[in-house]
């Protein structure tokens, strides 16, 4: 198998998704955070590709190089990624999602159990009240005219601990000690996934161990090795 490096658009679920593909080997899908793009996870993309994986770094609907939308829902984004997986004939791919991307990964596996071979999330939440730092929630709600992307953060996702118990994939649930996601919420997610583990990183915030950092990639590669992916 040869090393690939290209960008393209996938037509899925009624939208066009820009993505970058890099590497060769077992597939790993990378999903960025709210308002970001595949470039947000450039360091991790390179790191995983160099370690022998085929990375698909996707721009989520209405973000990055994609046409902006008037409204956004995590379930639609999860459906997009599910259809991307089907279209590319990927069998039980691994997914790493940062923030919104992590929500999408969990939502996908809740909607379609058994689709993913492994899940890693950084700074994800499965519901809003009691999951995020209060000051962050207060700031969200102070905005009298929230953007469509921000509006989604205010009211979604709406998953439950019971939903997490249906997730079949081995899962690595990560957040920073000083994350906007409360540590107890990160633990709630990981402890309810049957094959889940939790890592709270000392001294890190919501993005410090991900953006231009090898830390998250090292954790993911170690996780893949342990589960034989």
Predicted regions and their residues:
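Conserved HGGG/HGGXW glycine-rich cap/lid loop of the alpha/beta-hydrolase fold
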Residues: 18-64
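Short beta-strand/loop motif that positions the catalytic acidic residue
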Residues: 167, 173-175
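Flexible "cap/lid" loop of the alpha/beta hydrolase fold
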Residues: 107-111, 119-147
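Active-site nucleophile elbow and catalytic-triad environment of alpha/beta-hydrolase enzymes
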Residues: 148-163
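Gly/Ala-rich beta-loop-alpha elbow adjacent to hydrolase catalytic centers
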Residues: 97, 101, 105
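Catalytic active-site module of serine/aspartate enzymes centered on a nucleophile-bearing elbow/loop
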Residues: 203-229
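Conserved alpha/beta-hydrolase "acid-adjacent" motif
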Residues: 180-185
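Active-site loop/oxyanion-hole signature of alpha/beta-hydrolase fold enzymes
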Residues: 60-93
């Amino acid at each position: 198998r040869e090393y690939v490096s290209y960008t393209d658009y996938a037509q899925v679920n009624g939208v066009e998704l820009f993505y970058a593909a890099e590497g060769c080997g077992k597939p790993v899908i990378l999903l960025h955070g709210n308002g970001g793009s595949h470039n947000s996870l450039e360091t991790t993309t390179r790191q995983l590709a160099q370690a022998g994986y085929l990375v698909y770094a996707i721009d989520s609907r209405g973000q990055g190089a994609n046409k902006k939308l008037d409204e956004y829902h995590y379930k639609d984004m999860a459906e997009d990624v599910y259809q991307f997986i089907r279209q590319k004939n990927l069998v039980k791919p691994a997914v790493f999602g940062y923030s919104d991307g992590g929500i999408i990964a969990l939502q996908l596996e809740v909607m379609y159990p058994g689709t993913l071979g492994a899940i890693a999330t950084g700074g994800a939440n499965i519901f809003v009240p009691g999951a995020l730092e209060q000051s962050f929630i207060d700031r969200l709600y102070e905005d009298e005219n929230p953007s469509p992307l921000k509006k989604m953060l205010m009211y979604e996702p709406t998953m439950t601990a019971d939903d997490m118990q249906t997730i079949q994939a081995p899962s690595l649930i990560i957040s920073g000690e000083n994350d906007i996601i409360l540590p107890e919420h990160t633990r709630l997610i990981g402890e309810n996934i049957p094959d889940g583990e939790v890592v709270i990183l000392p001294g890190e915030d919501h993005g410090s161990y991900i953006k231009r950092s090898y830390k998250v990639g090292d954790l993911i590669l170690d996780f893949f090795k342990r589960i034989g992916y």
